[in-house]
Amino acid sequence: MAKAPMRVAVTGAAGQIGYSLLFRIANGDMLGKDQPVILQLLDLPQAQQAVKGVVMELEDCAFPLLAGVVITDDPKVAFKDADVALLVGARPRSKGMERKDLLEANAQIFTVQGKALDEVASRNVKVLVVGNPANTNAYIAMKSAPNLPRENFTAMLRLDHNRALSQIAAKTGKPVSSIEKLFVWGNHSPTMYADYRYATVDGQSVKDLINDPVWNNDVFLPTVGKRGAAIIEARGLSSAASAANAAIDHVRDWVLGSNGKVVTMGIPSNGEYGIPADTMFGYPVTTANGKYEIVKGLEIDAYSQEKINITLKELEEEKAGVQHLLG
């Protein structure tokens, strides 16, 4: 018996990340090779022509799982009955723009989108915010959708997680697939804290294998935290394919389960590990049956606590900067 199509809304559909994302969703990489999808694509009025071009290419791939495509500039059309919503579109920082202005510009976008999701999306919609500042944008969307369960809103920390994995693989000379229990705490920003104290590679402790706190502090964390800037420097454009890949990983694990593996998701806190409730924070989680669960009982040493406090402070400042816009 063929499955009924799932409706996947993608905002910023004409953008670089969208272009890397849509073909993989239509190919079944995100929701499974037996799951038909209907893509509901949102972008600004001036981008509609570009979205049409992308849709022509999607048609030309003749994906067996692509059951339909909707193109719109109206969030209520894009989010109608959506099972999954990938909020990729966000206002990028332009030259001379203060972070405060960026937060405010995005707060307006994500308030509108949160309200539209609240009105028309499936009550079980799984929302992933990719557009930066991702944690705070996800917080705004969640707060603007009081009738949806707050745990349905998540922010993308998976790119930081995958970047950390690849750095550990390079350092240990082991394949990425052999590394487990690595995760990232906090904000999707250079303050994130990638934590390999519990990680193993082929069952061996990564911490013991590397055994180099100076490398951790001076090389590993800055490399992972500033990787986005390094890619802009090298490529002249921000990371798009790797961000799309991380979004696919995040949603795939959330929907289909992580098979016991620990992954990282930005999720609303319930006070776990001393993080104030409602903060959209990167946590180690496992996923099963469409739900995520925070890994409990991890010891936080003094160094880790200091790093967590730094990223939390940044998130609290961002949150304070948009509070007046949330009514």
Curated annotation (Swiss-Prot):
Catalyzes the reversible oxidation of malate to oxaloacetate. Belongs to the LDH/MDH superfamily. MDH type 2 family. NAD(+) binds at residues 12-18, 106, 113, 130-132. The keyword Transmembrane does not apply. Keywords: NAD, Oxidoreductase, Tricarboxylic acid cycle. The active site is at residue 188. GO terms for biological process: malate metabolic process; tricarboxylic acid cycle. This is Malate dehydrogenase. The keyword Iron-sulfur does not apply. Substrate binds at residues 93, 99, 132, 163. PANTHER family: MALATE DEHYDROGENASE. It is an enzyme of class 1 (oxidoreductase). Its EC number is 1.1.1.37. InterPro entries: L-lactate/malate_DH, Lactate/malate_DH_C, Lactate/malate_DH_N, Lactate_DH/Glyco_Ohase_4_C, Malate_DH_type2, NAD(P)-bd_dom_sf. GO terms for molecular function: L-malate dehydrogenase (NAD+) activity. It catalyses: (S)-malate + NAD(+) = oxaloacetate + NADH + H(+).
